């Protein structure tokens, strides 16, 4: 549902805006030039973002449980309904809710690490908003597909392309744990953790290098154009 995509998008926008604003205002340069380990700076940012991500995952799971519980509030005696839902395997235990929350938490961490890298590439406020588009598309494509088709029934090529998008596994998490597809759930979670390590490694290399102060997407092309204009 849309409740799966919103925490990912909100957290990505939050950290991307923070990093890009710090870079544009030269606050990031001052911070990384201070007599403090850059690893400590990056770690503190990720810890703060991780706490926010954990809170968002908890709020998400609380909202999800309240939403599913609210569907039956106006039905009066719900014992027969609840029994039918249990017979069809359409209920989730606390442990299953926790599994879904864990995958949501990892997905938010992935979006945060990607946002840190993309935010470091922004050269102005306008480009910072554009940098959010890859994460938005990565979240919305599997979300929209999951609404209209069963991703597991797609052709192998398309299915594995969709599986390569890390957020796909988050949108399928509740379905997987509800119907006992724990192998697919575990595979998706392992893939997400590996991708998270890769994204964090890239972010660490960028923040540990002085290139973070000058690197940006499109900056060189703009310089060449301006030089050609001055030459004329």
Model-derived regions: residue spans:
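Membrane-interfacial helix-loop-helix junctions in multi-pass membrane proteins
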Residues: 89-94, 144-194
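A structural motif at transmembrane helix-loop-helix junctions in multipass membrane proteins
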Residues: 91-137
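Hydrophobic/aromatic residues in alpha-helical transmembrane segments
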Residues: 11-15, 63, 114-117, 170, ...
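Selective transmembrane-helix segments that form parts of the transport pathway or gating/packing helices
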Residues: 36-68, 101
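Short, small-residue-biased leader/transition segments that mark boundaries at the very start
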Residues: 2-6
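Short helix-loop junctions at transmembrane helix boundaries
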Residues: 57-99, 120-121, 148-153, 173-177
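Transmembrane helix boundary and interhelical loop/hinge segments in multi-pass membrane proteins
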Residues: 12-34, 209
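Junction motif at the cytosolic side of a transmembrane helix
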Residues: 117-124, 194-232
């Amino acid at each position: 549902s849309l409740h799966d995509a919103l925490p990912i998008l909100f957290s990505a926008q939050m950290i991307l805006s923070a990093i890009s604003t710090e870079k544009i205002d030269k606050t990031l340069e001052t911070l990384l030039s201070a007599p403090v380990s850059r690893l400590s700076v990056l770690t503190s940012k990720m810890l703060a973002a991780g706490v926010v991500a954990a809170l968002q995952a908890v709020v998400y799971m609380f909202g999800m449980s309240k939403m599913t519980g609210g569907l039956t509030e106006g039905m009066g005696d719900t014992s027969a309904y609840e029994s039918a839902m249990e017979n069809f395997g359409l209920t989730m235990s606390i442990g299953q809710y926790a599994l879904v929350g864990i995958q949501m938490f990892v997905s938010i961490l992935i979006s945060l690490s990607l946002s840190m890298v993309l935010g470091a590439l922004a050269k102005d406020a306008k480009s910072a908003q554009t940098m959010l588009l890859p994460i938005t598309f990565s979240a919305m494509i599997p979300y929209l597909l999951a609404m209209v088709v069963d991703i597991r029934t797609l052709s192998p090529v398309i299915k594995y392309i969709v599986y390569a998008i890390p957020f796909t596994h988050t949108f399928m998490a509740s379905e997987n744990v509800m119907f006992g597809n724990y192998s697919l759930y575990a595979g998706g979670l392992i893939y997400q953790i590996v991708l998270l390590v890769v994204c964090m490694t890239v972010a660490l290399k960028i923040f540990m290098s002085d290139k973070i102060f000058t690197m940006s997407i499109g900056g060189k092309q703009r310089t060449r154009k301006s030089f050609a204009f001055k030459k004329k």
